[in-house]
């Protein structure tokens, strides 16, 4: 491993040894090798690179005395500054932990501090024409312009020739002895408050966890700022790549105007021709999320959908030699570009070509940059240091001397030292309230108002469109609905209310989903708003994350709860953290529908329909809803959609599979598990706020409180009916919301009887019941309590499932045991 001290000493020694150029060039001139960069642009890239390197050193210095809390360095990856230069500052960028130079250059671009390219010269004619090309067979010295017999005939003042060849901005100084000397101005010195210093302040604030840090406000160290179009990400193992795919797809759909004609399209946060850039390193390239994202990108391109995403992989050589190149090059549907990431001129040239191709074609590409990992977790070849390569380019091209670049390095180093000392004195987050303020704001009054406004629109201006969408017969006129039918109708009403709502998932369009819940939606709203995806849950959630970030309201469906478990990091690490990592500047509203919970009726479920929800309830800020009845499902879904729009909430709507098509409660044909769909005029009155339970009174309702959810509601009501025949009055509390739990309702209804039976269809260990009992203990409940829960087992197939799951009989027996105390 190259230590920070060794790396710094080596770079300083190499800069000092570079010497001075043989011939000085003006910074406004292009590189002599015909590259697209000017000297000023190359110098700006060097500034971004050295700022990033010095931030690495500053981070080590701060951590040395316990004030720096983040030490993943960008050293060796600074070539990505050239990628930033090849893009526009309005192109959304999702970076990774080693993207320091990219961030610094993007900040300079946004501040107008990155020099513009020289204007294209007009075609040369007449007196402006270049020298005539020598005729074949004649040497250049023998060629002469038209009208001259030979070069000796030209009447040109040698002084004019010398002056004309001087660099722009240079001059001739004549001393007392009459000797003339060409003088080229020194390099402009970095200002203490320039864009690179400002970017460094951002990063240093993140390193010391300052509450003034512009992205996460001291909550985490990320690269992110809304005004720079840099979206903060955890970038853990490439987990941000699926979001980039979703963002690219959403931007292209918005650009193509796929919203319905009667809906007002909201202004997209990025330009219509923006491209998404997503950076990752070779360490992330083999992780599941990255593989899923690249596969999904290629699949969409294969099907004809356009996704303008430029993936940038910085290959530090940690994988087997040639492996990353082979895998990226072989990706179908993704155009491959490659460059030496230590050479800013080559990187800029190829990155500009790749970015322009993606921008024009609206198709995906990957830019594979060779890099070197220095300092942390690396033992790369210091001779390939990108800073040293850029310095050599500046010196050999005649723009600077090694001494000047070393002085620049030192001056910037002292600037950053002063900034580091200043941010040390800035306030830190000092209270739980400050920390969680932007995690998941809850504004129930605004959510309720949004539901009321949707109702007013559906009953008023939108009544005609609603009638047409439902074929002239809205759901409130079709008679009692099942759970599945109620959800289908509520989805349709949600799509009518908000033109940006999109429903997607595996087979949700063509087949209406696994259980027919989305049947008919594509016919009503079109393939742009209801569409099929690959079955991979990570990819589906990534599409939702990107769509929400772009201003849409995504409603993805995951086929089964088991599949969601394999993709939960997209919820935990990406969706739920967006506001937390951006102080609310970015948000990704989303309502994830997932059929789940094990069926005691015979389907079983460890292979498809898991009965575990613990991993979802553990995610801070995530809303978890479990509707049991049709007359709860529709208003709860409306609440989730409204909360997503108003607060940017991320909601998981778990739909009990076993109850989808159930019609009866107590006896066959009683139709008591169906319900009328509420007309729009009743939506506001029947609004179900997040975190509010529903209570059913059976008999006197004074002897026992049964707290449950999902399948447990139907079973508990049947058990309560049996107990009522024995003279026991019960109140059944349907939690409806598992995160946040309806604690106030739990305490009130438990205290009313003094006996609580918690019926938890999830597993005994880590199940919902643990949270309910903890809430009772925390609030000082002193009555009796007992729990009936599923066994700590996977759910077997068929009738054997009844041996491990909760049943009405088990609930009845548990109640009798509790009452006998």
What are these regions, as identified by a protein language model?
Residues 226-425, 618-754:
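Glycine-rich ThDP/TPP pyrophosphate-binding loop and its adjacent helix/strand module
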Residues 1-87, 94-97, 119-137, 146-151, ...:
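Conserved acidic/glycine
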Residues 54-57, 61-140, 147, 151-162, ...:
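Cofactor-binding active-site loop characterized by glycine-rich and histidine/acidic residues
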Residues 69-77, 97-98, 221-242, 339-344, ...:
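Active-site nucleophile and cofactor-binding loops and adjacent substrate-binding regions
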Residues 299-311, 529-532, 576-595:
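A glycine-rich helix N-cap at a beta->alpha junction
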């Amino acid at each position: 491993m190259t230590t920070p001290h060794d790396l710094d000493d080596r770079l300083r020694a190499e800069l000092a040894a570079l010497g001075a150029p043989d011939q000085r060039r003006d910074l406004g001139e292009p590189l002599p090798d015909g590259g697209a960069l000017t000297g000023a642009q190359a110098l700006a890239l060097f500034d971004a690179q050295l700022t990033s390197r010095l931030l690495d050193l500053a981070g080590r210095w701060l951590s040395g005395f316990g004030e720096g809390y983040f030490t993943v360095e960008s050293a060796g990856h600074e070539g990505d500054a050239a990628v930033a230069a090849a893009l526009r500052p309005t192109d959304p960028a999702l970076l990774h932990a080693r993207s320091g130079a990219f961030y610094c250059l993007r900040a300079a671009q946004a501040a107008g501090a990155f020099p513009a390219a020289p204007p294209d010269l007009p075609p040369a004619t007449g007196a402006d024409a270049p020298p005539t090309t020598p005729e074949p067979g004649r040497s250049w010295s023998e060629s002469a312009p038209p009208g001259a017999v030979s070069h000796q005939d030209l009447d040109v003042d040698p002084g004019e020739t010398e002056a004309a060849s001087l660099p722009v901005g240079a001059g001739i100084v004549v001393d007392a002895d009459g000797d003339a000397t060409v003088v080229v101005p020194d390099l402009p010195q970095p200002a203490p408050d320039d864009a690179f210093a400002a970017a460094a302040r951002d990063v240093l604030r993140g390193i010391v966890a300052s509450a003034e840090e512009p992205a996460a406000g001291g909550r985490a160290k990320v690269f992110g700022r809304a005004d720079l179009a840099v979206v903060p990400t955890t970038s853990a193992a490439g987990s941000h790549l699926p979001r980039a795919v979703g963002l690219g797809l959403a931007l292209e759909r918005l650009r193509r105007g796929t919203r319905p004609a009667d809906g007002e399209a909201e202004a997209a946060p990025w330009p219509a021709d923006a491209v998404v850039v997503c950076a990752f390193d070779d360490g992330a390239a083999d992780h599941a999320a990255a593989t899923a994202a690249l596969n999904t990108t290629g699949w969409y391109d294969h099907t004809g959908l356009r996704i303008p995403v430029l993936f940038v992989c910085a290959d530090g050589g940690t994988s087997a030699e040639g492996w990353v190149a082979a895998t990226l090059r072989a990706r179908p549907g993704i155009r491959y570009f490659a460059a030496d990431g230590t050479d800013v001129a080559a990187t800029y040239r190829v990155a500009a070509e790749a970015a322009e191709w993606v921008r024009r074609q609206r198709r995906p590409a990957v830019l594979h940059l060779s890099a070197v990992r220095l300092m942390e977790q690396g033992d790369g070849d210091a001779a390939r240091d990108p800073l040293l390569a850029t310095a050599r380019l500046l010196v050999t091209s005649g723009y600077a001397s090694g001494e000047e670049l070393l002085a620049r390095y030192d001056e910037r180093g002292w600037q950053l030292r002063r900034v580091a000392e200043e941010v040390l004195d800035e306030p830190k987050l000092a209270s739980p309230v400050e920390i969680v303020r932007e995690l998941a704001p809850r504004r129930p009054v605004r959510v309720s108002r949004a539901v009321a406004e949707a109702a007013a629109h559906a009953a008023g201006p939108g009544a005609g469109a609603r009638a047409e969408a439902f074929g002239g017969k809205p759901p409130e006129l079709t008679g009692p609905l099942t759970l599945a039918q109620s959800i289908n109708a509520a989805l349709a009403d949600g799509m009518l209310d908000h033109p940006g709502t999109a429903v997607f998932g595996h087979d949700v369009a063509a087949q209406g989903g696994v259980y027919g819940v989305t049947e008919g939606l594509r016919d009503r709203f079109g393939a742009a708003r209801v569409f099929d995806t690959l079955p991979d849950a990570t990819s589906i959630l990534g599409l939702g994350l990107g769509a929400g970030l772009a201003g849409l309201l995504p409603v993805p469906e995951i086929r089964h709860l088991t599949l969601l478990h394999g993709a939960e990091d997209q919820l935990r690490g990406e969706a739920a953290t967006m506001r937390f990592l951006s102080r609310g500047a970015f948000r990704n509203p989303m309502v994830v529908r997932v059929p789940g919970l094990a069926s005691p009726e015979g389907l079983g479920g460890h292979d498809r329909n898991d009965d575990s929800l613990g991993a979802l309830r553990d995610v801070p800020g995530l809303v978890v809803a479990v509707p049991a009845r049709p007359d709860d499902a529709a208003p709860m879904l409306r609440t989730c959609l409204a909360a997503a729009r108003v607060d940017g909430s991320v909601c998981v709507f778990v739909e009990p599979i076993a109850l989808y098509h159930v019609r009866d409660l107590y006896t066959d044909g009683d139709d008591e598990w169906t319900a009328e769909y509420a007309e729009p005029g009743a939506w506001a009155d029947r609004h179900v706020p997040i975190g509010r339970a529903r209570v059913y009174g059976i008999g006197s309702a004074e002897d026992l409180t049964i707290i449950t959810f999902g399948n447990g509601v139907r079973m508990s009501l049947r058990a309560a009916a049996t107990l009522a025949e024995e003279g026991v009055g019960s109140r059944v509390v349907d939690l409806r919301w598992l995160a946040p739990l309806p604690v106030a309702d739990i305490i009130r209804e438990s205290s009313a009887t003094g006996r609580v039976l918690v019926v938890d269809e999830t597993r005994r260990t880590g199940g919902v019941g643990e949270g309910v009992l903890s809430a009772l203990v925390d609030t000082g409940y002193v009555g009796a309590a007992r729990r009936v829960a599923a066994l700590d087992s996977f759910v077997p197939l068929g009738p054997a499932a009844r041996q491990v799951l909760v049943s009405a009989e088990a609930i009845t027996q548990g109640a009798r045991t509790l009452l006998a105390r």
